[in-house]
Every structure is written in C-alpha cells, then in structure tokens.
C-alpha cells in the first residue's frame, strides 16, 4: 500500500497581500500572465501589475470568459504563448483558477493561484474541473504539479458577497465526510495513492473549524469585516479543505454535485450549494441515523445553506428526470465508488428524494 500527500509549494494569507505578489513570485519566472474575469480584473489588475513591476517582472492580462472549458483553455494558452509568459496567475473563483492551472500544464512554467473568494477548495489543488461551454460537468484533469504559490488576500475575500464564503463552507464541510468514507473503504485519494493520516486529520480539522467559526465569519463578512473567525474560515475553505480533499479523497457528495450539473435548473446554484445537497444525500446513502442527518441539516439551515432540491433550482423533483442525475453521479469514473459499499443509480435517486424530504421537514418545523 502506497500513501501519497501533496500540496502547493507556498501558501500566503493575510490582509492586502495582493500588493505583495511580486515579492512572492519573483523567483518563479520573468513574465506573468494574469487570468481573471472582467469584475476581478477591475479589482486587482493595477495592484498586481504594479507589484510585479516592482519585483522586476513583466506582466500582461487576459480576460477569462467564465467557463473552464477546453475551448477557453486553448484560447488562453495561445495568449500565454504569444506573450512569452512563464508564470500564469489565475485570479478569481474556482473556474478561473482551474483554467489557469490547465494553461500552465499546456505551456509550462509556474502557476500562481490567487482566489478572490473563498467559495471552493480549488486554489491549492493539482486538478481542474472541466465543464462544457454550457456549464455541465465533463471531467477532472489531474496534473503532476500543484500551484507554486497560493496567495489569499483576506480583505478582498471579506469584501465579496457573503454567499461565496457560505458556499465555500459547504464545500469544506463535505471534505470531512468524503475523506472519512474513503478511509473506511480503503479507496484512493485524488493524488494517486491511499489517504495519509495527515490528509484525513486535515479534513477533520477543516470540519471542526467550520463548525466553530462558520456562523461568526458569515456575520462578519456581511460588513466586509476581517476577524479571527473570518481568517479561520478562509483558511479552512481554501487550505484545509484543499489539502483534505486531495490527500483524503472524495466520495459521494461531489459525485452527486456532478450529477446535478446535468440539469440546467441547477446552473444558478454555486458549486458549494450543490455540494451541500450532495453531502446530505451521502449521509442518507451511508445510513446515518435520523438524528445525525437532521443535526447536519439544522446547521446548514443556520448558515443559510440549501437543504432541499428546490433551493438549488429543482422545484418539482418528481417531474424532473433525477435518473439523469443519478446515472451521471454513478459514472464509472466517479468518486462515489470510493464509498465503503457498492452504489447504484437507483440508490442515488432514492437518497436524493429522501434527503430533499428530510431537508424540507427540518427546515420548516
């Protein structure tokens, strides 16, 4: 049995660290390409390029169009080659960062991950989630290299809408349940080996941190405030969840998310919002007690996370083809098969409907 743990080379988190990116990146190369959508570009472009210039680095920018699709990756890779970039900086949300990772894989050089929201655990990982141009999950692309640098400006993250931090909490909560399932099944993690004890414990620490600080952090960011709880939750959503899911492993929750993306009705829900439905579904699949499942649903409701299919856009579950979701969740390449028992599409469909009913009952009582 071979256990594997991998991580980024450097992780930096703090107030206003955007202006320090040049200091941290100067040893990585000579010419940087900033990849971000228009909103993020307006927020950080001048600070990033000023810091790069102060460190003696050349820099240029390209606007990310919104989907981490194969076509978008090819387009931006072409820009990187034309600009002679040997550092790719991905800034923004998970899809921008995953696109930047894929571009680095194609053109070589170094990669800097610069999340402006703490809505997911993509910043630290060595994989990209690939979607169609219409937002449907297609594949995971795995890489040998992690980001060389992850830099998280807590001022920027706290100023983003609270929904993003809330979404990241949902993604982070799933990390523990999935890593624990993989540990029980003896399955593989996301970096090519069996989970390490460190990966498992980091996933558990992520869960404990979010339970302890989640509500307070959400209160703070409603006022764009950075507190100890905000710092703790940003680290949990980004670093602990990222290391925990890669080196601990994924199971049913993210497979259910991937299945849900097949329905256009869910495309306005964030990654984490769909994952939260996946977590409740996983708990049902695994046969946890009603009390355990209801306790998780109650905490989700306290944080404002979705606990029913209606809250992620599926207003009439009985009239929607949930078999499409279940079949996609059980694709042979999916991590749902790292659960400690065999899972079938019929089981997933029934668990989704049961999770939805339990969520509605607990939310409305």
From Swiss-Prot:
Residue positions binding NAD(+): 37, 94-95, 116, 119, 125, 127, 131
Residues that, per the record, bind Zn(2+): 171, 254, 271
Origin superkingdom: Archaea
E.C. numbers: 1.1.1.-
Description of activity control: Is subject to substrate inhibition.
GO molecular-function terms, A-Z: glycerol dehydrogenase (NAD+) activity; metal ion binding
Entry's pH dependence statement: Optimum pH is around 6.
Record has Zinc as a keyword: yes
Family per record: Belongs to the iron-containing alcohol dehydrogenase family.
Protein's name according to its UniProt entry: Glycolaldehyde reductase
Naturally occurring in which organism (per UniProt): Halobacterium salinarum (strain ATCC 700922 / JCM 11081 / NRC-1) (Halobacterium halobium)
């Amino acid at each position: 049995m071979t256990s594997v743990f991998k991580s980024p080379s450097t992780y930096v988190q703090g107030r206003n660290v955007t202006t320090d990116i040049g200091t941290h990146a100067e040893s990585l190369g000579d010419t940087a390409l900033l990849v971000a959508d228009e909103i993020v570009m307006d927020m950080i472009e001048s600070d990033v390029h000023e810091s790069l210039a102060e460190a003696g680095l050349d820099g240029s920018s390209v606007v990310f169009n919104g989907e981490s699709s194969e076509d978008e990756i090819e387009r931006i890779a072409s820009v990187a080659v034309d600009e002679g970039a040997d550092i790719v900086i991905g800034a923004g949300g998970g899809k921008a960062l995953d696109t930047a990772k894929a571009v680095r894989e194609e053109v070589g050089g170094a990669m800097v991950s610069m999340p402006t929201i703490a809505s997911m655990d993509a910043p630290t990982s060595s994989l990209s989630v690939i979607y169609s141009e219409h937002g449907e999950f297609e594949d995971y692309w795995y890489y040998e290299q992690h980001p060389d640098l992850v830099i998280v400006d807590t001022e920027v993250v706290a100023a983003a809408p609270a929904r993003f931090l809330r979404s990241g909490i949902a993604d982070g909560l799933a990390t523990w349940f999935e890593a624990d399932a993989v540990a029980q099944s003896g399955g593989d993690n996301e970096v090519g080996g069996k989970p390490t004890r460190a990966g498992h414990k980091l996933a558990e620490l992520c869960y404990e941190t979010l339970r302890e600080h989640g509500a307070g952090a959400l209160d703070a960011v409603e006022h764009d405030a950075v507190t100890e709880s905000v710092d703790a939750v940003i680290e949990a959503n980004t670093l602990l969840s990222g290391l925990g899911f890669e080196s601990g492993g994924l199971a049913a929750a993210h497979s259910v998310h991937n299945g849900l993306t097949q329905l256009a009705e869910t495309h306005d829900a964030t990654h984490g919002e769909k994952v939260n439905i996946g977590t409740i579904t996983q708990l049902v699949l695994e046969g946890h007690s009603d009390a355990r499942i209801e306790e998780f649903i109650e905490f989700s409701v306290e944080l404002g996370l979705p606990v029913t299919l209606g809250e992620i856009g599926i207003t009439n579950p009985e009239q929607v083809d949930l078999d499409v979701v279940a079949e996609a969740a059980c694709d042979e390449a999916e991590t749902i098969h790292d659960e400690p028992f065999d899972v079938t599409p019929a089981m997933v469909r029934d668990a989704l409907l049961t999770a939805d009913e339990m969520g509605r009952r607990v939310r409305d009582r």
